[in-house]
């Protein structure tokens, strides 16, 4: 299982780091068409999974990140959860936690997003990040056991 865990972790780390590469390449693209093209490609890929609204995104290198603040929080939570996962749970333990932990972890993000959507208030990027982080961190403990169990059954 350790081998598969490392493959998943490294793959996700590449995905995560590319969130930072898009604005960095956009910055380099201010003086180079090559880097501008690469950044446009990265933004296009991430546009498939995120709205990328500038007012809901963090900026680095003077350019918005490849995903919005909430998505960035989710992916940061997933990465942190994946890194600490083997310290909390054995990789060959396929039992998932009680569903209520996941529901409770999703409530802050749902409340934040819904209250903004219906116009009760305007959220802010730090809150979007935090609520996304909570959800992303928690979901790891549900998805990885299912994934590892599938791998175990396939290759046992």
Swiss-Prot record:
Chief localisation class: membrane
Keywords: Cell membrane, Membrane, Transmembrane, Transmembrane helix
Bilayer-spanning residue ranges: 6-26, 34-54, 68-88, 100-120, 129-149
Compartments reported by the entry: Cell membrane
Cystine connections: none
Membrane-topology annotation of the record: Multi-pass membrane protein
Gene Ontology CC entries for this record: plasma membrane
Name the record gives this protein: Uncharacterized protein MJ1492
């Amino acid at each position: 299982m350790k081998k598969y865990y490392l493959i998943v972790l490294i793959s996700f780390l590449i995905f995560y780091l590319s969130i930072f590469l898009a604005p960095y390449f956009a910055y380099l693209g201010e003086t180079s068409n090559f880097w501008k093209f690469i950044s446009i490609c990265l933004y296009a890929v991430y546009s498939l999974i995120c709205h990328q609204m500038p007012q809901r995104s963090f900026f680095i290198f003077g350019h918005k990140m490849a995903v919005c603040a909430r998505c960035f929080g989710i992916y940061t939570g997933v990465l942190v959860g994946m890194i600490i996962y083997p310290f909390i749970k054995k990789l060959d333990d396929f039992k998932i936690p009680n569903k209520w932990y996941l529901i409770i972890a999703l409530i802050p993000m749902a409340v934040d997003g819904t209250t903004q959507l219906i116009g009760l208030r305007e959220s802010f990027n730090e809150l979007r990040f935090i609520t996304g982080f909570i959800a992303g961190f928690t979901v790891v403990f549900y998805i990885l056991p299912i994934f590892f169990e599938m791998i175990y059954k396939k290759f046992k």
